[in-house]
């Protein structure tokens, strides 16, 4: 009796696991479809960059003065690009923050030329810019979706920018597929963990 109840419990757990895996796979397999409907963008936090913040006196025109991708971060960005290809995203309009770790992440995705836009630049060191930067990002998103409605749009930025825009905290290399309303603001989202 105890063995039979244990088997039934195990069968139920396994059935729920299979259903969950199928639903997750279906959600991932359909990534290319929403990204070409003129309503979605894929925001990505730059890949792994060891350390915290940028060194004092860093300059955007000198990567050597910034916190940059480590070897793991470079591989993480490449694996993310391969994963996107498996989801049907072979090319995209790719936008990046001016910070080198973001530009390098965007470049290593290998989805097309990288368009550097200050709207995606970090305000971590000056939080008083949060509203201004978030509004700039909203305008960039709205303009890009109007300009490229049938082209996947990928934007590589920083955790503070993405959190301010979506309300979601992402880890290094994580992505968030965001459905955008007519006003350029997020309606819904789905998070995709970074490649490990």
Where do the protein language model's features map onto the residues?
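Bacterial N-terminal signal peptides that target proteins for export
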Residues: 2-14
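Bacterial N-terminal signal peptides
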Residues: 13-24
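Sec/Tat signal peptide C-region and signal peptidase I cleavage site
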Residues: 25-29
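Active-site-proximal alpha-helix that buttresses catalytic centers in soluble enzyme cores
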Residues: 30-118, 123-127, 132, 168-196
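Generic beta-sheet signal
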Residues: 39-41, 151-157
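Glycine-rich phosphate-binding loop signature in dinucleotide/nucleotide-binding domains
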Residues: 87-89, 144-150
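Short, well-ordered beta-to-alpha junction loops that form the rim of enzyme active sites
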Residues: 96-99, 156-160
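A short, acidic, amphipathic alpha-helical segment used as a generic capping/interface helix at domain edges
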Residues: 136-146
